[in-house]
């Protein structure tokens, strides 16, 4: 899974990326300090995997990972190549979802390229650039469909679908907010459009603001925007998260406890990303390795096996599965077997989040 972190210059985007990866990407008080996208692989916190590792004490511990890409700052006119616009658009096209960092704090020492703090204006600037880029893509798709329709009339419907979408985009609305028949949306999804991507708005506040975020006027403004398009908002203080990320694990837990938090804002972002993209994890365990594997919700057992190795899917026989909670209550796989909690599932079994799995195959 790849998430692109976007935002106008000086909204806290690179600070948040530093916190996410603890990579120390240059964070400077001027536009375009992030010219090439910084990429960081982040482990997904999973207490279930930690528990399995405590039982098996494996040689290798492999959590699921998310790839975060810190994408260059954006300005008005990016869709026409202003600033670093073309680079921005090509980099964001390669992501699965967008984390849009929106400034929700006042600080006269940190210059805002558009003037004062205004979440609605900032969201509209980036949305407009992405929508304009999508309009260009859709216009090309209509042109291609019309040309193909000369030899095959089925393309007439495709042209009509994209013409209707173009009208929607012309109104300044994203593909995410577009409603149409499921089969038409499947067709639209083949076009690699930017505003179809799921989005999380990261409301970046100062420490005082995030401590009482529900009463933060900027946060409330951003929530209203997100609600209108079915997006999610995460209150976060990027500077605080950067400090937390720099601590050792034990110190981190103590610091969070002092703040009255059960988890960091980054952990919440990762979990929200999983939910947003419809992802779950299944687990494999043994003395050699305990590992979490990421799959789409609704994935069947053979395809899940294929995530481990193509031979597992090709020669799939069955999956031996125990729900994590059952395994934990029993204390071991052997005890779970004795209680008859380990099930044998066939090729039509749909995987559940937290399934502890052993695949049987023959090639």
Q: Model-flagged regions — what are they?
A:
Residues 32, 46-49, 62-68, 82-96, ...:
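Amphipathic alpha-helical transducer elements in NTP-driven molecular machines
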Residues 40-45, 72-82, 93-155, 168-181, ...:
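Conserved Switch II/interswitch segment of TRAFAC-class P-loop GTPases
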Residues 2-6, 11, 17, 144-350, ...:
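C-terminal-of-GTPase-core extension/linker across diverse P-loop GTPases
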Residues 92, 351-352:
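Short, well-ordered loop/turn sites that connect or cap secondary structure elements
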Residues 1-111, 127, 139-140:
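Conserved G1/Walker A P-loop phosphate-binding module
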Residues 23-31, 38-40, 48-51, 80, ...:
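Glycine-rich, flexible loop/turn motifs
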């Amino acid at each position: 899974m790849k998430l692109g972190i976007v935002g106008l210059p000086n909204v806290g985007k690179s600070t948040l990326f530093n916190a996410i990866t603890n990579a120390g990407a240059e964070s400077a008080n001027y536009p375009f300090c992030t010219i090439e996208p910084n990429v960081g692989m982040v482990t997904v916190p999973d207490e279930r995997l930690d528990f399995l590792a405590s039982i098996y004490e494996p040689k290798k511990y492999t959590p699921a990972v998310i790839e975060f890409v810190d994408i260059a700052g954006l300005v008005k006119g990016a869709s026409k190549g202003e600033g670093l616009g073309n680079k921005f658009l090509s980099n964001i096209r390669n992501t699965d979802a967008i984390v849009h960092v929106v400034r929700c704090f006042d600080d006269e020492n940190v210059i805002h390229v558009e003037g004062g703090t205004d979440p609605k204006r900032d969201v509209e600037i980036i949305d407009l650039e992405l929508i304009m880029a999508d309009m260009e893509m859709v216009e090309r798709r209509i042109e291609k469909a019309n040309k193909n329709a000369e030899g095959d009339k089925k393309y007439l419907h495709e042209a009509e679908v994209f013409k209707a979408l173009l009208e929607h985009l012309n109104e300044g609305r994203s593909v995410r907010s577009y409603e149409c028949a499921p089969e038409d949306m499947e067709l639209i999804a083949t076009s690699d459009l930017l505003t179809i991507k799921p989005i999380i708005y990261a409301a970046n506040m100062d420490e005082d603001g995030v401590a009482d975020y529900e009463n933060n006027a900027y946060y409330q403004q951003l929530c209203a925007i997100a609600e209108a398009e079915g997006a999610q908002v995460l209150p976060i203080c990027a500077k605080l998260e950067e400090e937390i990320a720099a601590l050792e694990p034990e110190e981190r837990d103590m610091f969070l406890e002092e703040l009255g938090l059960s988890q960091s804002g980054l952990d919440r972002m990762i979990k929200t990303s999983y939910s947003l993209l419809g992802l779950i994890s299944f687990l494999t365990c043994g003395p050699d390795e305990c590992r979490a594997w990421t799959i789409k919700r609704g994935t069947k057992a053979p395809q899940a096996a294929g995530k481990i190795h193509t031979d597992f899917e090709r020669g799939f026989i069955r999956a031996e599965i125990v729900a994590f909670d059952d395994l934990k209550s029993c204390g071991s796989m052997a005890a779970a077997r004795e209680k008859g909690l380990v099930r044998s599932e066939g090729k039509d079994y749909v995987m559940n989040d937290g399934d502890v799995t052993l695949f049987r195959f023959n090639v």
